[in-house]
Amino acid sequence: MESLNKDSKIYVAGHRGLVGSAIWRNLEKRGYTNLVGKSHAELDLLDPVAVRQFFDREQPEAVILAAAHVGGIMANLVNRADFIYQNLQIQQNVIGEAWRHGVKKLVFLGSTCIYPKNAPQPIREDALLTSPLEYTNEPYAIAKIAGLKMCESLNLQYGTDYIAVMPTNLYGPGDNFHLEHSHVLPGMLRKMHLAKMLNRGDMDGVRADLRRLPVEGCDADRMSDAEIATLLAKYGITAEALHLWGSGKPLREFLWSEDMADATVHVMLNVGFDQLKGDSTEVRNCHINIGTGKELTIAQLAEMVKETVGFEGRIEWNAEKPDGTMRKLCDVSKIHSLGWHHTVELADGVKMLYDWYLNAERPASR
């Protein structure tokens, strides 16, 4: 495993996203001074010619691939071709050009959706490809599996040192708080905040929130209090209660994005493929789960968010709505054995996320 110097050129693909921006900050904090990042307008990762020209020009020594085409349940279900095509293309272009340009080290970020729908819990890395995937995000998952297999195969055939990491559910600064398509934790936090404002009769606070991040393109300053209340009620947000989907019984694991960034950089600097491939003649499952190894129910999460936000109304569950997978927990023994552990517990992370949300000039909408 070749070492990197503080002035080694490191390309962070997706440096403006939730994880990519955290990785950038982590590298800066560690004293790395030669970081390269390009916005989508500056570099279209779907364009093979543009990506090759970028690598010709920049010649990075290391690459962190945190860029991906992502979305929620409905987007994955409806836009299946986009999710497999765009992610395969991004991976083919970036990982392929990294190899062709002799990049020393690459870390590829995947997702725990690569694992079978009914994988034994906690999910070990060797559960990969043992049974069918969840149908909803199957195209996205197959693209991510192809990415990790591309890294693994390049290592075996050409001696590269490209490592794939699979994060659990992430949350943190710069998260997506859009009511229409946010993930569970940031969406729940914003809903709870708006319910608190309604509960207190603070319509100025509600309007301030909707100005920063409009819902369905609304103009809060031109809407009456009743019109705003009707709009928010569509999302289960009322003064008396916050109505959430499902039974609240599913178990989930959450990882602070800054912890994920630290794990990614730790792997880049301290973990080599030789440590992962083992002694078997059939080398597989060299990827690494990144998570906390801790879980809680969605109902427990809702109570935690309620206490943090200070909402004094009720939480009501609509059991007629789907729960999704009932349990999804990573086995994190491999990353622990490689010297990394998470540092931010969920209760602290929720408080930090709410503080960020209240003080951010404009929460990310992505």
Language model features with spans:
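NAD(P)H-binding glycine-rich loop region in Rossmannoid oxidoreductase-like domains
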Residues: G37, P48-L88, E97-R100, K117
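Active-site segment of SDR-like NAD(P)-dependent oxidoreductases
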Residues: V70-G71, T112-P120, T168-Y171
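Hydrophobic positions on the long internal alpha-helix
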Residues: I90, V94-A98, M150-C151, A263, ...
